[in-house]
Swiss-Prot record:
Name this protein carries in UniProt: 3-aminoacrylate deaminase RutC
Coiled coil: none
EC category name: hydrolase
Name of encoding gene: rutC
Annotated source species: Cronobacter turicensis (strain DSM 18703 / CCUG 55852 / LMG 23827 / z3032)
Reactions catalysed according to its record: (Z)-3-aminoacrylate + H2O + H(+) = 3-oxopropanoate + NH4(+)
The entry's keywords: Hydrolase
Any one of the GO CC terms: cytosol
EC id: 3.5.-.-
Function field: Involved in pyrimidine catabolism. Catalyzes the deamination of 3-aminoacrylate to malonic semialdehyde, a reaction that can also occur spontaneously. RutC may facilitate the reaction and modulate the metabolic fitness, rather than catalyzing essential functions.
Amino acid sequence: MPKQVIIPPGASTPIAPFVPGTLADGVVYVSGTLPFDKANNVVYPGDPKAQTRHVLETIRHVIETAGGTMEDVTFNSIFITDWKNYAAINEIYAEFFPGDKPARFCIQCGLVKPEALVEIATVAHIGPSGGA
């Protein structure tokens, strides 16, 4: 099955050469997602909970556009700028994954815009019937 580019309706234009998601063989690969509005400005500066919620809602939109749900998520790569925000980020993260949690890792690093506190990249296995 050839890969499909996944661009949800109303998605912002990426600030680099990538797409929000790619579907291949029933797997959705969601690009690193930052707390950006449609004009690529950081939303909710200084608020790790609101930024995390925005990021996960954006990821959900990509996965749903591909035909999946957040229950299909199998792996998340989480990048945070400060460990002091770890508990707040996890609080919101747990709301999006209330049952069995996907595998993940979390590292502290700098992000492309200094006001961004969190970035998440995701893999979801939606199966052969999924697709945009």
